[in-house]
């Protein structure tokens, strides 16, 4: 049987807001926007640690608080950043990634996190066999729900094995976009239907899916994640689905209302003193998150 996550989420896909990774202003922005689904990376929390270190965060740390105030939180393994981002160029081995997995497990267990955890999908750097080693090992050592990630290296036979093994499976949308740039939407739709037809109770996650059209086409999936809500404060421009506008053009009354809400959270609930510039950044990001939530609701149903 699956995790029953779709029952928890009602009957349609829920988009998890990614990219905050424990930052106070991002936490306040998303809370003020009344979003209820998050995805964060454990990368910075385990990078410089050893497996036997103390991974405990303060009880009021954002990572621990968001684990309880949201309907669902997904923890990414940070493996992509380790392999292709900040850690690019470092030689990874079975031993080094075993240590990474040990640290990930210790971090989750010591902080009593209830989040769903993404596996160490190392197919591209170590191979499919090694990915299965980590997949089976993590299922044995960690009680949390887990997401297993399909990559092209697995092949369709490997996908069948993953479906049989998994309760919750993810498709990497950025990978599909790169490998099949002209047909990735159709390929995603084919794969999601294939997975559901083979195992109707399985949960499906669309990893890194920023495409609202794809979210609508695959609304029967369980979850997706996106950093689109941060594009406005990162690039200055934001698309609400009808028109593209600069964040400086947001209505002043809406900015003031959201600024007040963000300040109440940061100064009142969190006990922080942030600069006016940071608070304005948070208010704008929060409004972008609200717009995204509205877009997802129109495309795929309630995001409550």
Predicted regions and their residues:
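Glycine-enriched alpha-helix->loop->beta-strand junction motifs that scaffold or abut catalytic
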Residues: 33-38, 69-70, 141-144, 163-170, ...
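Catalytic cores of alpha/beta
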Residues: 89-96, 154-164, 209-223, 269, ...
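Active-site-adjacent beta->alpha loops and helix N-cap segments on the catalytic face
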Residues: 49-63, 123-138, 155-157, 176-194, ...
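Non-catalytic, usually N-terminal nucleic-acid engagement modules in DNA/RNA processing proteins
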Residues: 1-140, 268, 296-304
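Glycine-rich adenosine-cofactor-binding loop
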Residues: 148-150, 172, 185-191, 195-216, ...
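Short beta-strand/loop segments at the ligand-binding rim of alpha/beta enzyme cores
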Residues: 10-14, 70, 75, 140-147, ...
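Histidine/lysine/aspartate-rich catalytic loop segments that bind and position anionic ligands
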Residues: 148-179
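Glycine-rich phosphate-binding active-site loops on the catalytic face of alpha/beta enzymes
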Residues: 173-175, 210-249, 283, 291, ...
């Amino acid at each position: 049987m699956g995790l029953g996550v779709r029952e928890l989420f009602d009957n349609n896909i829920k988009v998890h807001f990614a990219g905050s990774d424990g930052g106070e202003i991002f936490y306040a922005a998303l809370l003020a926007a009344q979003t209820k689904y998050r995805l964060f990376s454990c990368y910075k929390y385990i990078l410089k640690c050893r497996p036997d270190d103390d991974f405990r965060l303060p009880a009021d740390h954002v990572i621990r608080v968001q684990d309880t105030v949201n309907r669902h939180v997904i923890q990414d393994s940070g493996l992509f950043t380790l392999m292709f981002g900040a850690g690019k160029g470092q030689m990874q081995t079975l031993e080094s990634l075993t240590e990474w997995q040990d640290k990930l497990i210790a971090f989750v267990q010591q902080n009593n996190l209830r989040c769903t955890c993404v596996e160490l999908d190392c197919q591209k750097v170590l191979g499919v066999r090694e990915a299965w080693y980590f997949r089976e090992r993590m299922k044995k050592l960690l009680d949390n729900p887990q997401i297993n990630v399909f990559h092209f290296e697995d092949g369709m036979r490997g996908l069948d094995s993953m479906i049989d093994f998994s309760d919750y499976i993810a498709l990497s949308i950025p990978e599909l976009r790169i490998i099949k740039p002209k047909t990735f939407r159709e390929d995603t739709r084919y794969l999601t239907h294939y997975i559901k037809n083979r195992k109707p109770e399985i949960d499906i996650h669309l990893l890194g899916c920023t495409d609202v059209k794809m979210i609508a086409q695959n609304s029967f999936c369980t979850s997706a994640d996106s950093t689109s809500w941060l594009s406005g404060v990162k690039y200055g421009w934001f698309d609400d689905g009808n028109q593209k506008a600069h964040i400086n053009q947001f209505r002043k009354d809406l900015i003031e209302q959201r600024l007040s809400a963000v300040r109440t959270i940061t100064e009142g609930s969190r006990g922080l003193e942030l600069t006016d510039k940071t608070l304005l950044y948070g208010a704008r990001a929060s409004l972008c998150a609200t717009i995204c939530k509205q877009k997802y609701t129109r495309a795929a149903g309630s995001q409550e």
